[in-house]
């Protein structure tokens, strides 16, 4: 089993548990160049809020798009947008990525901005 298949297997297991709980989830995805975050409704078919380093507003406020500072900016933005829509409690879906580096930076920034998970 290769690295990507292992990550997807871990992500599927976590998503199944979150769906069982019926929680709104904060989903993250990272690539070497960008970080993406979405708040998804419990039914799994509606995106409530989204933020990423691809967006011009966020990209202009940071020097690089693929580092921890960029992830923190995305975390702050997604928290603000979710709270604006009335969502304050979420389940953190790390998509099988290790809770370290950019993933942890995004999560901590979202918590500091007011999201609870």
Curated annotation (Swiss-Prot):
A single MF term (Gene Ontology): structural constituent of ribosome
Gene Ontology biological-process entries: translation
KW Amino-acid biosynthesis (keyword) present: no
Pfam families linked to this entry: Ribosomal_L18p
GO cellular component, one term: cytosolic large ribosomal subunit
Keywords carried by this UniProt record: Ribonucleoprotein, Ribosomal protein, RNA-binding, rRNA-binding
Disulfide pattern: none
Classification via InterPro entries: Ribosomal_uL18_bac-type, Ribosomal_uL18_bac/euk
Function: This is one of the proteins that bind and probably mediate the attachment of the 5S RNA into the large ribosomal subunit, where it forms part of the central protuberance.
Assembly description: Part of the 50S ribosomal subunit; part of the 5S rRNA/L5/L18/L25 subcomplex. Contacts the 5S and 23S rRNAs.
Family, similarity comment: Belongs to the universal ribosomal protein uL18 family.
Protein name: Large ribosomal subunit protein uL18
Protein species of origin: Photobacterium profundum (strain SS9)
Gene that specifies this protein: rplR
């Amino acid at each position: 089993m290769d690295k990507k298949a292992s990550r997807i297997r871990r992500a599927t297991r976590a998503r199944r548990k979150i769906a069982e709980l019926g929680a709104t989830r904060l989903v993250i995805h990272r690539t070497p160049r960008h970080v993406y975050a979405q708040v998804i409704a419990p039914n799994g078919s509606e995106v409530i809020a989204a933020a990423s380093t691809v967006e011009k507003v966020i990209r202009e406020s940071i020097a690089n798009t693929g580092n921890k500072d960029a992830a923190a900016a995305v975390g702050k933005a997604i928290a603000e947008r979710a709270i604006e829509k009335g969502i304050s409690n979420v389940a953190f879906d790390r998509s099988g990525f290790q809770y370290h580096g950019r993933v942890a930076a995004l999560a901590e920034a979202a918590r500091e901005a007011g999201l609870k998970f």
